[in-house]
Amino acid sequence: MTEHQNVDHAEIAKFEAIAERWWDLDGEFKPLHEINPLRLDFIANKTGGLFDKETLDVGCGGGILSQSMARMGAKVTGIDMGQEPLTVAKLHSLETGVNVEYIKVPAEQYASEHPARFDVVTCMEMLEHVPDPASIIHAVAELAKPGADVFFSTLNKTPKAYLYAIIGAEKLLKMVPEGTHDHKKFIKPAQLIAWAEQAGLKVRASAGLSYNPLSKQYSLNTDVSVNYILHFEKLA
């Protein structure tokens, strides 16, 4: 599969259709806004701080994480294949004065053009939306410098993840639009780690992300059965 084929146009269309509401704190992307501080803290902690680090956000969408990392002093580039989310991200960057470079380009192509460039690479909630997640993981590894910090987050392929992310979040609680996720595309941590190790990455830490529907609060913990985040180091 070439890099230009590793795009699910139906997935892109889902996010294009609602891109204008990316920064609406009570809209379809409310869960992303709510988990962002937890993701950001995890990344900042594992990297020892982001200040002045060349940082790439793969699958950046409307720029929620990208802009948060830039506010911490990182030199951030965000790449995505959705034009509307990138347009929203650029406008929000102009409105807030937070400097992020946004580019529409496949990760594989960008990796061939910028190998071993970045100190930090993030790829959050993207792998479950592409036809070939292993290809993205290899591109991310290629983009990272030796010793760089690399982060992936996605959904575990478990019955609990189906129950919580699709039945609960989509159908019952209406937290995200119905059809956002496909359980067949969820990825077990062992599979993600295997792909990452093949690409020259070494796992360093993991965390689970849980939602309490009673308190309506998210938390990081050791339960990786639904949402999880993995931290890797690029080997020399």
UniProtKB/Swiss-Prot annotation:
It catalyses: a 3-demethylubiquinol + S-adenosyl-L-methionine = a ubiquinol + S-adenosyl-L-homocysteine + H(+); a 3-(all-trans-polyprenyl)benzene-1,2-diol + S-adenosyl-L-methionine = a 2-methoxy-6-(all-trans-polyprenyl)phenol + S-adenosyl-L-homocysteine + H(+). S-adenosyl-L-methionine binds at residues 39, 59, 80, 124. InterPro entries: SAM-dependent_MTases_sf (IPR029063), UbiG_MeTrfase (IPR010233). Pathway: Cofactor biosynthesis; ubiquinone biosynthesis. One of its GO terms (biological process) is methylation. Keywords: Methyltransferase, S-adenosyl-L-methionine, Transferase, Ubiquinone biosynthesis. The keyword Transferase applies. Pfam families: Methyltransf_23. GO terms for molecular function: 2-polyprenyl-6-hydroxyphenol methylase activity; 3-demethylubiquinol 3-O-methyltransferase activity; polyprenyldihydroxybenzoate methyltransferase activity. The keyword Transit peptide does not apply. It comes from the Bacteria. Its EC number is 2.1.1.222, 2.1.1.64. O-methyltransferase that catalyzes the 2 O-methylation steps in the ubiquinone biosynthetic pathway. Belongs to the methyltransferase superfamily. UbiG/COQ3 family. This is Ubiquinone biosynthesis O-methyltransferase.
